[in-house]
Amino acid sequence: MTSPESSSAAGSGDRAVAAAAERAKLTAGRNIPSFDDLPLPADTANLREGADLSDALLALLPLVGVWRGEGEGRGHDGDYRFGQQIVVSHDGGDYLNWEARSWRLNETGDYQERGLRETGFWRFVRDPDDPSESQAIELLLAHSAGYVELFYGRPRTQSSWELVTDALARSRSGVLVGGAKRLYGIVEGGDLAYVEERVDADGGLVPHLSARLSRFAG
């Protein structure tokens, strides 16, 4: 006999699947714009279009798409809310393109000012001499605040990934920041959620950013 709890859980799961199917009707036909006069494969954020995803990236397949939503941040001036768009695309190569743009929101949830912005690439480590590294991930990022960062990590599950800063370099005009730890995951309803902690002036990891983003394209 099915318990009320399991029936409720099953119903919740069914609703989540139905909601995801409805969203897919909208997102499946969307992609990022591209120029069609270049001689190489175009970037695509939709796995239904463009070049096939490299076999080397199959463990990152759920990330591909355009994601939009809101999150919470903690800065020198206190806590704040932000909107964000993340674009994860590929051109058939052995890397994913990554671009994240955010903007601060005011108390009514409207745009207030530009926020953090970063661009870079996800890659898998290839080391024939060390098979244990075959699932290691590199995330190379350039931040608009004036620093570049290399994250290193591994998949935790088929739909979650954990990374920590391995190296960080600041430009002469860049902000002072510490290393970070990030956890990304596909959560209920197919959303992309993440949390980031950064090292503060006392040398400890403290909450910095968190967000939950819904698929907009792909």
Curated annotation (Swiss-Prot):
Protein name (database record): Peroxynitrite isomerase 1
SUPFAM superfamilies: Lipocalins
Summary of the function given for this chain in its UniProt record: Heme-binding protein able to scavenge peroxynitrite and to protect free L-tyrosine against peroxynitrite-mediated nitration, by acting as a peroxynitrite isomerase that converts peroxynitrite to nitrate. Therefore, this protein likely plays a role in peroxynitrite sensing and in the detoxification of reactive nitrogen and oxygen species (RNS and ROS, respectively). Is able to bind nitric oxide (NO) in vitro, but may act as a sensor of peroxynitrite levels in vivo.
GO molecular function: heme binding; metal ion binding; peroxynitrite isomerase activity
Renumbered ranges of motif GXWXGXG: 65-71
Keyword set, alphabetical order: Heme, Iron, Isomerase, Metal-binding
Organism for this UniProt entry: Mycobacterium avium (strain 104)
Alphabetized HAMAP family for the sequence: nitrobindin (MF_01297)
Pathway: Nitrogen metabolism
Subunit details: Homodimer.
